[in-house]
Amino acid sequence: MIIRDLPLKLRDFPEKEKPRERLLHFGAEHLSNNELLAILLRTGTKHESVMNLAHRLLRTFDGLRLLKGASAQELSSIPGIGTVKAVQILAAIELGSRIHKTSAGEHCVIRSPEDGAKYVMEDMRFLSQEHFVCLYLNTKNQVIHKRTVFIGSLNSSIVHPREVFKEAFKRSAASFICVHNHPSGDPTPSREDIEVTRRLFECGNLIGIELLDHLVIGDKKFVSLKEKGYL
């Protein structure tokens, strides 16, 4: 669905509706995803305004959900995008990701499930496949290492404790937190999620490297299996 009958050239928009002018007047945080993307794209096509082009691009990738993981080839194959616009989009996404990692800090202290979710949310909430990640912590609960252990549907027979604890020993970790995403955006834990959690928790108790929590990441939402009583 076209968002509405818009003029084809951005210069023909009413001054108060132009995305760049709105950003300067109100601030970037008050612009929609559509407007921010239109600023990146800069121009539309002969038959479509830049606002409609941005809207169509977001619709193609289910909003921002899949846009982060799109390749240059996938983006440039969309009519009206092309190589230059695809590169601009990917550069902006990567820059945002790097800024987030810098602000999070290399040795982020995790004191709560909210801290853990915040540390991984922007990296994980748009992934199109399940990623099982371990955050290894020192005695001060600082993240000393982050490792993707497995990619694919979570299964207790696939996520082997050996792989998880081998890295823990290598990093001299005092404890760890497991994190995995649900590509659907719904962080409700599955039976397999719970089984994997309990298995790793029991192994951690035997070895002396405590599993502090298992976080399931959705789209701007998360569930702590510790808070749910599974640890």
Swiss-Prot record:
Residues annotated as signal peptide: none
PROSITE patterns the UniProt entry points to: MPN, UPF0758
MPN domain residues: 109-231
Record carries keyword Hydrolase: yes
Pfam family, one: UPF0758_N
InterPro entries reported for this sequence: MPN, RadC_JAB, RuvA_2-like, UPF0758, UPF0758_CS, UPF0758_N
Motif JAMM motif mapped to chain: 180-193
UniProt keywords, alphabetically: Hydrolase, Metal-binding, Metalloprotease, Protease, Zinc
SUPFAM superfamilies noted in UniProt: JAB1/MPN domain (SSF102712), RuvA domain 2-like (SSF47781)
Binding site for Zn(2+): 180, 182, 193
A molecular-function term among this protein's GO annotations: metallopeptidase activity
Gene Ontology BP, a term: proteolysis
PANTHER family in alphabetical order: DNA REPAIR PROTEIN RADC, UPF0758 PROTEIN YEES-RELATED
Family that this chain belongs to: Belongs to the UPF0758 family.
Protein's UniProt name: UPF0758 protein RBAM_025090
The species this protein was found in: Bacillus velezensis (strain DSM 23117 / BGSC 10A6 / LMG 26770 / FZB42) (Bacillus amyloliquefaciens subsp. plantarum)
